[in-house]
């Protein structure tokens, strides 16, 4: 970018029911306790399953997401076309399959300022129920790191944080199959430009993905969320000016509901990122990003700059937005 009781035999159930009936009749015969009072007492004693049901945004673990980031950082620099990025791909695929997702590799070759490079997007859909409707919402991140000749760039925040978050979202959402089948996960390769962002340099994966969608007909997707650089210890999510207004309102409302609104604001300048090619083909996609990050594209973009709390904040708000707004209908 740039500026997740055993069944009781019927007979035993009947016996318990008969004994309960006897006890109630006995109470009514030998006590002055009104039936209404007894019914109220029994009703109050029955626990409510709804009251104790865990909300999906409460299931997200910033600590688990951070472990994914750590694994990617441990691989070292993994720019597009490198041996290390193949290891990153294998790790992402393994984690997604463990959470119940089927992964497809979308491989292609493109011209770059460094010559032809092979890129691979990873596209995941939830397993099972092949007759279900096609996914209608995109969740995206890039997983490559920028290529530098002079520094060792591991991209803990830029590439790592959003990938770790998306893997944790996959775990949490995968526990709710009906919701998971509405979502397509996309891990873009080649987000980073080799020289300067332009129509032909940078956003290689998202540009190719959008082009294929447009050729096939992109009408099935009614929206998407892109995550990028969301792990900064001093978190300040800044939505770009080109954010689809309705989606921005939903993100702000989700943050407000979780009492996290102070972490979300608007960016005061335009931003080029992987959401742009999707918006260009009329898939309203919002970029959740903290672009004011002092270590962007430096050797100091390392794991110590990332916090589980920041990942927790972003993941919780995203899940609230998905469950209460984006996928509500």
List where the protein language model places each region:
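Intrinsic disorder/low-complexity segments
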Residues: 1-39, 43-45
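Extracytoplasmic/secreted proteins, especially bacterial periplasmic and envelope-associated proteins
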Residues: 64-71, 87, 91-98, 103, ...
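Active-site-proximal beta-strand/loop segments in catalytic clefts of secreted hydrolases
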Residues: 72, 106-108, 126-128, 140-144, ...
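Acidic/histidine-rich catalytic neighborhood of metal-dependent amide-processing enzymes
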Residues: 150-254, 258-259, 267-270, 275
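Acidic/histidine-rich, surface-exposed loop or edge segments in extracytoplasmic proteins
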Residues: 65-78, 148-150, 187, 234, ...
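Active-site-adjacent substrate-binding region
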Residues: 84, 105, 109-111, 223, ...
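A non-catalytic alpha/beta surface segment that caps or lines the substrate-entry region
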Residues: 56-58, 67-129
């Amino acid at each position: 970018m740039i500026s997740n009781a055993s069944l009781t035999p019927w007979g035993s159930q009947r016996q318990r029911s008969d004994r309960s009936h006897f006890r109630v009749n006995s109470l009514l015969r030998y006590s002055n306790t009104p039936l209404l009072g007894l019914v109220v007492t029994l009703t109050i004693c029955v626990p409510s399953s709804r009251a104790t049901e865990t909300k999906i945004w409460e299931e997200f673990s910033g600590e688990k997401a951070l472990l994914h980031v750590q694994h990617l950082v441990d691989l070292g620099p993994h720019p597009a076309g490198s041996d290390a990025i193949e290891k990153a791909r294998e790790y992402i695929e393994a984690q997604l399959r463990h959470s119940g997702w089927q992964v497809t590799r979308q491989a292609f070759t493109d011209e770059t300022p460094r010559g032809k490079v092979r890129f691979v997007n990873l596209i995941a859909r939830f397993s099972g129920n092949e007759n279900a409707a096609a996914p209608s919402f995109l969740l995206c991140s890039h997983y490559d790191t920028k290529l530098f000749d002079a520094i060792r760039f591991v991209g803990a925040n830029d590439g790592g944080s959003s990938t770790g978050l998306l893997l944790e979202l996959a775990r949490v959402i995968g526990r709710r199959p009906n919701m998971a089948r509405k979502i397509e996960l996309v891990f873009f390769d080649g987000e980073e430009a080799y020289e300067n962002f332009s129509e032909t340099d940078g956003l290689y994966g998202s540009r190719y993905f959008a082009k294929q969608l447009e050729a096939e007909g992109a009408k099935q997707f009614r929206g998407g969320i892109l995550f990028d650089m969301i792990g900064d210890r001093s978190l300040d999510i800044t939505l770009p000016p080109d954010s689809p207004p309705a989606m921005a309102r939903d993100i702000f409302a989700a943050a407000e509901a979780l009492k996290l609104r102070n972490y979300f604001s608007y960016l005061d300048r335009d931003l080029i990122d992987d959401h742009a090619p999707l918006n260009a083909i009329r898939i309203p996609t919002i970029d959740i990003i903290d672009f004011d990050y002092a270590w962007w594209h430096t050797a100091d973009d390392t794991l110590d700059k990332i916090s589980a709390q920041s990942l927790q904040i972003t993941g919780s708000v995203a899940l609230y937005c998905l469950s209460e707004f984006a996928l509500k209908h």
